[in-house]
Swiss-Prot record:
Function: NAD-dependent histone deacetylase, which contributes together with HST3 to histone H3 'Lys-56' deacetylation, regulation of telomeric silencing, proper cell cycle progression, DNA damage control, DNA recombination, and genomic maintenance.
Additional free-text comment from the UniProt record: Present with 377 molecules/cell in log phase SD medium.
Protein name per UniProt: NAD-dependent histone deacetylase HST4
Binding positions for Zn(2+) per the UniProt entry: 221, 224, 251, 254
The gene coding this protein: HST4
Matches recorded under SUPFAM superfamilies: DHS-like NAD/FAD-binding domain (SSF52467)
Annotated family: Belongs to the sirtuin family. Class I subfamily.
Keywords from the named record: Metal-binding, NAD, Nucleus, Repressor, Transcription, Transcription regulation, Transferase, Zinc
Active site per the UniProt annotation: 213
Main localization of the protein described in the UniProt heading: nucleus
Keyword Glycosyltransferase (UniProt): no
PROSITE patterns: SIRTUIN
List of residues binding NAD(+): 100-119, 184-187, 310-312, 340-342, 363
GO cellular component, one term: chromosome, telomeric region
Organism: Saccharomyces cerevisiae (strain ATCC 204508 / S288c) (Baker's yeast)
Length: 370
């Protein structure tokens, strides 16, 4: 008969026993830190939206901020719309912002299409011609004007600081509430901020900010595609002779490769030309497919707020992105705000379909509603 071995129910005497009175609480649990976190969680909990204006309602932001000329009844009526904006800014959890040049005007950088914008200062042609690829690189005089504009914008933006609106977006991104900023701006004020940084060239992981039209902060070779910080000293801006500058400067990296190939007895492959890394009309967007992929992925998220700000949406591709996001946000019972200094054209609002509130005035004032 085989003897069965039974393991002892109690551990052997050599096992270390802990006293029953020992405190077994999680050592990482710090009650004094936990309580403020719980309070913050309760405070940030999204309350129920009690008021929604009719679609395409208009709110005069400047008049509301400077309410000295408003009657008591007018102020009371506008308080509801102001509360609606405040709700969107304070409680939205997954926001998409599509911005234009209007958000940088307060920093000292002019916009493009207003009565005092960049396009209005162009002599001998339309302002749009300065951003047309065929005109800029098909006519020497237009190339000079384009260089003047790019160098001027670069130096101006270098001496400007992000605005209160930029700072507000940076805070949204810091708090994890900004899904994406799609910016049409080339001044780079937004990407100076730590939580609105981007990748140049655009690459994964997808950054907080997607630059739809490039940036004046960089230049690129059309041949080797080498990207460098923009150097204004390379670009000729007038008719005066200067051996250090060219209207369309040659790429130093390509020239170096050519020198090496020549010394090695290899045939020439040509030297590329440098240009500001700004996307122009009538050229293929080098990152267009990737931006479309990012937008399509963002559309799959549960976006609860779309803010269109500082843009007239004249560019069809940008208007189409806004239209798709507006439909998605509306389906999610979110909020769509359109902030601009002037009333958007009816055809733009009809295309977007689901704008809850058109906020007229200086977008910097909206930060007072936080």
């Amino acid at each position: 008969m085989k003897q069965k071995f039974v393991l002892p129910i109690t551990p052997p005497s050599t096992a270390e026993k802990k006293p029953q009175t020992e405190n077994r609480c999680n050592e990482n649990l710090k009650p004094r830190r936990l309580l403020p976190q719980l309070k913050k969680s309760v405070r940030n909990r999204k309350p129920r939206l009690s008021y929604r204006p009719e679609l395409n309602s208009v709110f005069d932001l400047d008049a509301y901020v400077d309410s000295t000329h408003l009657s008591k009844s007018q102020r009371h009526h506008m308080d509801r719309d102001a509360g609606f904006i405040s709700y969107a800014l304070n409680y939205s959890k997954r926001m998409v912002v599509v911005s234009g040049a209007g958000i940088s005007v307060a920093a000292g950088i002019p916009d493009f299409r207003s009565s005092e914008g960049i396009f209005s200062t162009v002599n001998g042609g339309s302002g749009k011609d300065l951003f047309d690829y065929n005109r800029v690189y098909g006519d020497e005089s237009m190339s000079l004007k384009f260089n003047q504009l790019m160098v001027s914008l670069f130096r101006l933006s270098k001496n400007c600081q992000p605005t209160k609106f930029h700072e507000m977006l940076n805070e949204f991104a810091r708090d994890g509430r900004l899904l994406r900023l799609y910016t049409q701006n080339i001044d780079g004020l937004d990407t100076q901020l730590p939580h609105l940084s981007t990748n140049v060239p655009l690459a994964k992981p997808i950054p907080s900010t997607v630059q739809l039209h490039g940036s004046i902060k960089h230049m690129e070779c059309n041949k080797c595609l080498n990207i460098k910080p923009f150097d204004p000293e390379l670009f000729k801006c007038d008719d005066k002779f200067d051996s250090r500058t060219e209207i369309i400067p040659s790429c130093p990296q390509c020239e170096e490769y050519e020198t090496v190939r020549k010394m090695a007895g290899l045939r020439s492959t040509g030297v590329g030309k440098l240009r500001p890394r700004v996307i122009l009309y009538n050229e293929v967007h080098p990152e267009g497919d990737f931006i479309g992929e990012i937008a399509n992925n963002d559309l799959k998220k549960r976006i609860d707020c779309l803010i269109i700000v500082g843009t007239s949406l004249k560019i069809p591709g940008v208007k189409n992105i806004c239209r798709q996001f507006a439909a998605k946000v509306h389906a999610n019972r979110g909020i769509v705000l359109y902030l601009n200094t002037s009333m958007p054209p009816k055809n733009v609002l009809d295309s977007l379909k689901f704008v809850d509130l058109v906020v007229l005035g200086d977008c910097q004032h909206v930060t007072s509603l936080l």
